[in-house]
C-alpha cells in the first residue's frame, strides 16, 4: 500500500512538473552568476601601477586555476601582498626600466605575477620559492612570510627577489636561446635532482657551480648565475671565487662571460649596471626610505 501511494505521488508530481514546464517562459538571463569581487584600494593601486604602465596582472587573491594542487597552499595575506607588490615593482621591474628601458620591461617581463601565502615543500627537504610558466607567468610563494625577512637584504633576496630574477632569466632564455656552449662547461657533472642531497650540498663552488641548485641542469645553472650575480655585491662574488679555488673559479667565470655576452648582445643589458641598480634599490627597501604600504594614486 505504501509503495502504491508513493508511486501515485511521484506520478502526480511528475505531471505537475511537466505541466508547469510547458507553460512557463524561460528567462534568457543565466542563473549562473560570476563572483563579483569588490575593488579594494590595493586593486586600484595595481591598476595604475601594474596594469596601465606594463599590462602586468598582479594576482593576490587565491585563484584555484593558477594554483599547483600538488602542494598545500593558502591565500596571500592582503597586507603582505601589498608590500610584496611594492617591492617587486621597485626593485625588479623599475630596475630593468632604468637599465634596459621601459619598452624592454613592457615587452618581456611576465604578464602575470601570482602571489600565494605559503612556500611549497617537496619531500626531498627542499621548497619551491617560485616558478615561471610559458614565458608569461611568475608564481611567487611564501608571501605571508615576508615580514620575517624584511630586515635583511640576504633574506629578501634568498626567499623572494633572487627568485624573480632567476625566473625572468628563464623567460628571456625561452624567447632568445643562450649559447649551447654554456651547457658543456660543466656538462658531465650536473646532478639532476640529486643536487639537494648531501653530495650536492657541499663543494659545489669547487666543481664550478655558484649554488647547489645550479647543479640540477644547464638551464637552471645559467638562471642561477644571472640571479646570483645581480643580487650580490662584488665583494661577495669575489669571496665566492676565492672559495671556489682556481679550477672552480675558472669554470664559473666562463659561465659568467657567456651570461654577460648574452645579456648585452641579445638584450642590450649590462649586468654590472643592472646589479648596481638592483642593490641600490634593495638597500632603500631595507633602510625604510621607500614606503611599502602607500596606496595613494597620483
Residue ranges of predicted features:
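Metalloprotease/metallohydrolase-associated module, dominated by Zn2+-dependent proteases
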Residues: 190-274, 281-298
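Auxiliary, metal-adjacent structural segments of Zn-dependent hydrolase domains
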Residues: 26, 82-139
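C-terminal motif of bacterial Sec signal peptides marking the signal peptidase cleavage site
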Residues: 16-20
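Active-site recognition of the HExxH zinc-binding catalytic motif
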Residues: 154, 158-179, 223
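Acidic/polar, low-complexity intrinsically disordered N-terminal segments immediately downstream
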Residues: 4-5, 21-100, 105, 249-298
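Surface-exposed patches in mature extracellular/periplasmic domains of secreted proteins
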Residues: 96-114, 175-176, 236-246, 271-277
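Second-shell loop/turn segments in exported
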Residues: 70-78, 147-159, 208-216, 245
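Sec-dependent N-terminal signal peptides
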Residues: 5-13
